[in-house]
UniProtKB/Swiss-Prot annotation:
It comes from Rattus norvegicus. Induction: By SHH. Residues 95-154 form the bHLH domain. This is Oligodendrocyte transcription factor 1. GO terms for cellular component: nucleus. GO terms for molecular function: DNA-binding transcription factor activity, RNA polymerase II-specific; E-box binding; protein dimerization activity. Residues 41-105 are annotated as: Disordered. It comes from the Eukaryota. The keyword Metal-binding does not apply. The lineage of its organism: Eukaryota, Metazoa, Chordata, Craniata, Vertebrata. Keywords: Developmental protein, DNA-binding, Nucleus, Transcription, Transcription regulation.
Length: 261
């Protein structure tokens, strides 16, 4: 009998907690709610009860989530003084690059013109050019090497001339006609400076100038009409082709003395 009454009280306990009927049950239910920290929602409606209970169970940051403010549209920013200075500096750099490129282009054009002029002088003495294709242009390195060899050849010819003039062979010695034109080696021991040295390759024949040097008399000098005893002379020999001025103090003896030093 006692067990049946106790079981009935246990089964009726939840009902008294949810819906009190007696004052004792109300105090017991209130004290139980205070112990567990649970607040009973007001019994107004089922929807308000469910929403309030859900809101009470959610954490505080989730309940108070602020909305992000809308971004305001930004218009075109006005140009500042720094932007203008940067644009001006960039324009100046572009102008400087154009000037540098123009100067470099001009330098390369001048270099190509100078190399072409050097090729015109070197090609008649280039054996590789005579054997190869005539329309093929020598490279810059090959042209400079040929010019170096040509200069060394002229130096050796001058050494031979010094030795020949130092021996003192008399009037039949080779003559050095100073006309300010390219040097042409006629034979070992004889170097001629003749105005006809610049011409087509077929006209550059050493034997031609050697025969002229042996057959013709020495260069004659006669004073100019308006000149005096110390005035320069006028040479009109067959080797010289056309009259040109020869200083009065620069005869064959003076040339021999200059090269014998």
């Amino acid at each position: 009998m006692y067990y049946a009454v106790s079981q009935a009280r246990v089964n009726a306990a939840p009902a008294t907690m949810l819906r009190p009927q007696r004052p004792g049950d109300v105090q017991l239910g209130a004290s139980l709610y205070e112990l567990v920290g649970y607040r009973q929602p007001p019994i107004s409606s089922s929807s308000s009860t469910s929403s309030s209970s859900t809101a009470s169970l959610l954490p505080k940051p989730a309940r108070e989530k602020p909305e992000a403010p809308l971004a305001e549209p930004r218009g075109p920013a006005p140009e500042s003084g720094g932007a203008r200075a940067d644009a001006k500096e960039e324009q100046q750099q572009q102008q400087l690059r154009r000037k540098i490129n123009s100067r470099e282009r001009k330098r390369m054009q001048d270099l190509n013109l100078a190399m072409d002029a050097l090729r015109e002088v070197i090609l008649p003495y280039s054996a590789a050019h005579c054997q190869g294709a005539p329309g093929r242009k020598l490279s810059k390195i090959a042209t400079l090497l040929l010019a170096r060899n040509y200069i060394l050849l002229l130096g050796s010819s001058l050494q031979e001339l010094r030795r020949a003039l130092g021996d003192g062979a008399g009037p039949a010695a080779p003559r050095l006609l100073l006309a300010g034109l390219p040097l042409l080696a006629a034979a070992p021991g004889s170097v001629l400076l003749a105005p006809g040295a610049v011409g087509p390759p077929e006209t550059l024949r050493p034997t031609k100038y050697l025969s002229l040097a042996l057959d013709e008399p020495p260069c004659g000098q006669f004073a100019l009409p308006a000149g005096g005893a110390g005035s320069p002379g006028l040479c009109s020999c067959a080797v010289c082709k056309f009259p040109h001025l020869v200083p009065a103090g620069l005869g064959l003896a003076a040339v021999q003395a200059q090269f014998s030093k």
